[in-house]
């Protein structure tokens, strides 16, 4: 019987950070939980980052994942927004790293390709495939659905890497 691996996907953002937890065993996927962390826009940047860090740390402690998958940041025309997203992403990398989890990073196009089969697709397509692959999945936001897609992407790439290691050993 295959070992069960618990994966948390994290879709970082300063306003909202989505998270999704799945269990992965052999070729079986099971939804565990998903949600969205929000920071208080009335607070200063440092306080907002602390809110995200505490929220992620609490989720990691509650669900005890074995591995984390975090979305790569993308650069847009608004440099300030990109910097803030980068800072939120640093929290998304730091919290699982401090919990001694291996952290894997995936570009948005790689996540889309893993979940819907093409690198450029609408959010609705991703959300529909998350529901197909995880029929019991419940998510309260687009960010939580994207986080589940990240966890699914990691389960796919983890399987490929494991299979490759076995056949080349």
UniProtKB/Swiss-Prot annotation:
Catalytic activity: Endonucleolytic cleavage at a junction such as a reciprocal single-stranded crossover between two homologous DNA duplexes (Holliday junction)
Catalytic residues, chain numbering: 11, 71, 143
Stated name of the protein: Crossover junction endodeoxyribonuclease RuvC
Originating organism: Bartonella quintana (strain Toulouse)
Residue positions binding Mg(2+) 2: 71
Compartments, as annotated in UniProt: Cytoplasm
Keyword hit for DNA damage: yes
Cofactor binding mode and count: Binds 2 Mg(2+) ion per subunit.
Enzyme class: hydrolase
Assembly and interaction partners: Homodimer which binds Holliday junction (HJ) DNA. The HJ becomes 2-fold symmetrical on binding to RuvC with unstacked arms; it has a different conformation from HJ DNA in complex with RuvA. In the full resolvosome a probable DNA-RuvA(4)-RuvB(12)-RuvC(2) complex forms which resolves the HJ.
Xref: CDD domains: RuvC
Residues where Mg(2+) 1 binds: 11, 143
Needed co-factor(s): Mg(2+)
A single Gene Ontology CC term: Holliday junction resolvase complex
